């Protein structure tokens, strides 16, 4: 009885290690590809026509900040979210 329990536990342990290694291998390829993916996404979000400051960028007035951002009224002055979505900002 004890031998069969030990064999069962050993088989389960080997199966766990085997599936964990296979899963790690699958996720490893995602990690290798992620820098290239992030670099390509960075190009998508960069805009040559953007003359505004992004979130937490320094500012002196609301018009310095991008859409849906406003200049913080107290020091330190930087762009913060103005709690609007879509085309709500007037």
From Swiss-Prot:
Note the SS bond partners: 52-66, 59-71, 65-79
Spell out the subcellular localization from the entry: Secreted
Origin, by domain of life?
Eukaryota
Could you tell me the keywords of this UniProt record?
Answer: Amidation, Cardiotoxin, Disulfide bond, Ion channel impairing toxin, Neurotoxin, Secreted, Signal, Toxin, Voltage-gated sodium channel impairing toxin
Known Pfam families for this protein? Toxin_12 (PF07740)
- What does the tissue specificity note say? Expressed by the venom gland.
Q: Name one GO cellular component term.
A: extracellular region
Q: Which residues carry this modification: Phenylalanine amide?
A: 85
Chain residues in the propeptide: 23-50, 86-90
Q: Which residues form the signal peptide?
A: 1-22
The primary location reported for this protein is: secreted
Matching entries from InterPro entries are given as:
Huwentoxin-1
**Comment text on domains:** The presence of a 'disulfide through disulfide knot' structurally defines this protein as a knottin.
- Write out the similarity annotation: Belongs to the neurotoxin 10 (Hwtx-1) family. 39 (Jztx-34) subfamily.
Q: What is the official name of this protein in its record?
A: Mu-theraphotoxin-Phlo1b
What are the leading ranks of the lineage? Answer: Eukaryota, Metazoa, Ecdysozoa, Arthropoda, Chelicerata
